[in-house]
Amino acid sequence: MTLPLIAYAPVSQNQRVTNYEVSGDEHARIFTTEGTLSPSAMDNLIAAAYRQVFNEQQMIQSNRQIALESQFKNQQITVRDFIRGLALSDSFRRRNFEVNNNYRFVQMCIQRLLGRDVYSEEEKIAWSIVIATKGLPGFINELLNSQEYLENFGYDTVPYQRRRILPQRISGELPFARMPRYGADHREKLEAIGYFRNQAPLTYRWEWQKQPYPAGVYLAGKVVLYVGGALVSLGIIAVALSAWGIIGL
């Protein structure tokens, strides 16, 4: 037996403010299939859909749904169906649904599929009950079939963070992409089975910043650089003094 969605009250959010301004560089770029798209524009739309559903941190080859992309490029499915396919894929289930509790997963999906943050804990509980009674497919279908989704994105537009920037405010809301893929509870489980142990703090932030040689090699290089620079400087000074007749070479 499935339960109806529990009622919850909306709260004040940027996306509830009526939009009258002209879109600029600070506003979200809208990807839609309204009109004819070139092959490159179609690829950009597909990439935007992956980025919206999986987030930038999960833009990896193993998450690609080749068959779904083929259906979309051949106009067999709409943008909404493509988003639905990504959210119901095995990759999304394993990397997002199975590593989060229902409350956190609800927040992630509302951010990514409806383009806003959750209104309250009551909304988290309401949608968590949908997951418990209808499962992941039922929850995703409820979101994508909702009036809110259809009014804002319809069948042809990739979801995006709505009204992140308001011209009346100095700063906008933080992007939803900052939210990690899993929470502290799942990290504790990983630590319990041996992950993240005995790891020295990194001296670099990204892998491409990692020094390819040992520290001693760089120290020797610095010594050679400074000594060589000093010798070259002395040579230039000696040549100049010789040219002026002050010293003889």
Curated annotation (Swiss-Prot):
- What does the similarity note say? Belongs to the phycobilisome linker protein family.
Q: Which gene encodes it?
A: cpcL
Is Transmembrane helix one of the keywords?
Answer: yes
How does inactivating the gene affect the organism?
No visible growth phenotype, decreased energy transfer to photosystem I. Decreased accumulation of phycocyanin (PC), but no major effects on the phycobilisome supercomplex. A double cpcG1/cpcG2 deletion has even less PC. No change in state 2 to state 1 transitions (i.e. energy transfer to PSII).
Q: What organism does this protein naturally occur in?
A: Synechocystis sp. (strain ATCC 27184 / PCC 6803 / Kazusa)
- Biological processes annotated in GO: photosynthesis
Pfam families from the xrefs?
A: PBS_linker_poly
Record bears the keyword Thylakoid = yes
User: What UniProt keywords apply to this chain's record, in alphabetical order?
Assistant: Antenna complex, Membrane, Phycobilisome, Thylakoid, Transmembrane, Transmembrane helix
Annotated membrane-spanning segments are 223-247
Tell me the membrane topology, using the record's own terms. Single-pass membrane protein
List where in the cell it is found. Cellular thylakoid membrane
Q: What is this protein called?
A: Photosystem I-associated linker protein CpcL
Summarize the subunit comment: Part of a specialized phycobilisome (PBS), a structure that is usually composed of two distinct substructures: a core complex and a number of rods radiating from the core. This protein is part of a core-less PBS rod (called CpcL-PBS) with on average 5 stacked phycocyanin hexamers (PC, CpcA and CpcB). Linker CpcL connects the PC stack to the thylakoid, the hexamers are linked by 1 copy of CpcC1, 3 copies of CpcC2 and the stack is terminated by a single copy of CpcD. Ferredoxin--NADP reductase (petH) is also part of the complex.
Task: Describe the function of this protein.
Answer: Rod linker protein, associated with phycocyanin. Linker polypeptides determine the state of aggregation and the location of the disk-shaped phycobiliprotein units within the phycobilisome and modulate their spectroscopic properties in order to mediate a directed and optimal energy transfer. Plays a role in energy transfer from the phycobilisome to photosystem I (PSI). Although able to transfer energy to both photosystems, this is predominantly a PSI antenna.
Q: Which GO terms describe its cellular component?
A: phycobilisome; plasma membrane-derived thylakoid membrane
Main location group: membrane
Outline the extent of the PBS-linker domain: 11-189
